[in-house]
């Protein structure tokens, strides 16, 4: 009898632990979406010191990693968690959850709080992102992005670079070196938000419905893209 009760108690405790973990993972994922909204709003509020309009308006995908560094510490030892979305025929895809780790990060000592933004600029970069896991290299794969209202005419970001990376610290955006880092799907957050495992390719190609918890994030992405596009068109008419 005692053995049966012990097994039953262990089973109940295991179930409680599982539900607690699932609840915590969901809360963390929703919080990540909300913090990513703040980063996107910052992009829109600093056009002269932020990501160039033509870069943002031509990006095929946007990846936001809020609080890559907090209080001077890189969470998990050079490890951050973020959210990605890609353009589809119907607009922006539902958010896919990512983790970024390893590599050589060109961050200055003494920086306390840093957000990371990655922009996928061409089809090759898009295919890498859709693969669920890939490594960033410096040979055409990833480069520190140009900063300011307009990208320099001498840059080759439109044709050659798969992904441009930016850091945001104390409200200021800057290009960020991120060679050797590995970007992969965050399976725990994916399951927590969607209720099941879904592949990157399915989510980012527009085959997944946007969860309500991501409505604010999707709105911010759409507004940032539209603002950049309008500004670029105005500049072209001059």
What are these model-derived regions, one by one?
Residues 19-21:
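Aromatic (phenylalanine/tyrosine) cluster motif
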Residues 8-17:
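Bacterial N-terminal signal peptides
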Residues 1-9:
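Bacterial N-terminal signal peptides that target proteins for export
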Residues 23-238:
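Small-residue-enriched, tightly packed secondary-structure blocks
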């Amino acid at each position: 009898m005692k053995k049966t009760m012990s097994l039953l108690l262990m089973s109940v405790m295991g179930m409680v632990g599982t539900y607690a973990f699932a609840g915590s993972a969901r809360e963390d994922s929703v919080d990540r979406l909300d913090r990513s909204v703040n980063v996107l709003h910052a992009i829109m509020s600093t056009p002269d010191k932020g990501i160039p309009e033509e870069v943002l308006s031509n990006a095929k995908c946007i990846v936001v990693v809020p609080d890559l560094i907090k209080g001077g510490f890189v969470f998990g030892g050079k490890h951050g968690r973020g959210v990605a979305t890609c353009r589809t025929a119907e607009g922006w895809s539902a958010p896919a959850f990512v983790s970024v780790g390893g590599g050589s990060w060109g961050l200055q000592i003494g920086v306390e709080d840093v957000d990371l933004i990655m922009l996928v600029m061409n089809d090759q970069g898009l295919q890498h992102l859709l693969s669920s896991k890939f490594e960033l290299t410096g040979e055409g794969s990833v480069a520190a992005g140009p900063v300011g209202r307009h990208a320099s005419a001498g840059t080759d970001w439109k044709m050659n670079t798969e992904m441009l990376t930016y850091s945001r610290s104390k409200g200021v955006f800057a290009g960020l070196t991120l060679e050797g880092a590995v970007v992969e799907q965050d399976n725990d957050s994916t399951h927590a938000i969607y209720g099941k495992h879904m592949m990157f390719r399915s989510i980012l190609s527009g085959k997944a419905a946007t969860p309500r918890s991501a409505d604010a994030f999707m709105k911010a992405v759409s507004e940032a893209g539209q603002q950049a596009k309008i500004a670029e068109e105005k500049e072209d008419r001059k």
